[in-house]
């Protein structure tokens, strides 16, 4: 089945598989993409008795092996041999008794830590004519300028003329002007959910339809900022789902995302208009993945990006204890900054599933459920409740937990086994719980 423009999925099944069954399979991948092959992951969520990785290629190709992870092969062969009637090089890696990969809380992408290998072409030698494919990020910058669906789009300056209001154009402070342009793009154009370094239908289509992929929206954001006289460059990176960008192996095929970067008084400010809730220097969580490359006019600069803006969750319960021992009241769950981006995007993606999440988390009866934008860039869900499930009667006394349904017996840092991977937060965060309880006049604590 076709998953994306250049990707297909092949599925197969094993009949009569039961707990404890040992399955065996082999597959061969033939790729026309000689320069950058896909990663092959060598750890799974099931134990593996034996697995083997084989990479064969003609001797006139030269490859580097980008090997990442903590799993070491028990057997390794890297040698020349005769195959298919000509000289080949062959890499064979054998792994025995591989334990299952165990995921841990507070890890953005498990695949960053799963052992994998990726061959990358570094040279060819046809008829003693040697050609090196080793590149730098400056080379990548130069090539992207030539690509019609990247640099070619940025060069269409006429698409950004006479678009912004004169009020925006006249703002003297660069950061304030950039913020207004970000707001304009967010309110005018809508991201279609597709991530990419390159445009799909092009920026002209974005202008006509008001919908586009991430590259179309953010490249147009760059064009508008430049038209307004700002010093703005594209910054390319990997999204979290793509894995950390390996800066040691520069290639156009690695990054899959681009945002706008304003340089002002020696400082950098990042902008991403794909999310309606993003702010200056507050990107959607998918974009915070450590390594990034800033494509300046004359050079490429390697940067590290992290989210240092604190997000807060405010959980507010205003409850009344009735004389029949029921509780009634109102609950508000309000998120700010990164948490607001996540909540809003999840809500817009599927409103029914978002409400279902609350019904599964809070199993008592509630009504007047509402999710909405509040205070400009905050997202809030609220509901009213009436339940008899919070109070126990013991010896003529009524006993209830003062946090009511906000009480949690376990926390997310309850891992008992030794931790293997770094703790990764989407942002610094704080959770504030406030519970106000009104009791009948003739009751006392």
PLM features per residue range, with description:
Residues 1-445:
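A sensor for short, sequence-defined functional sites
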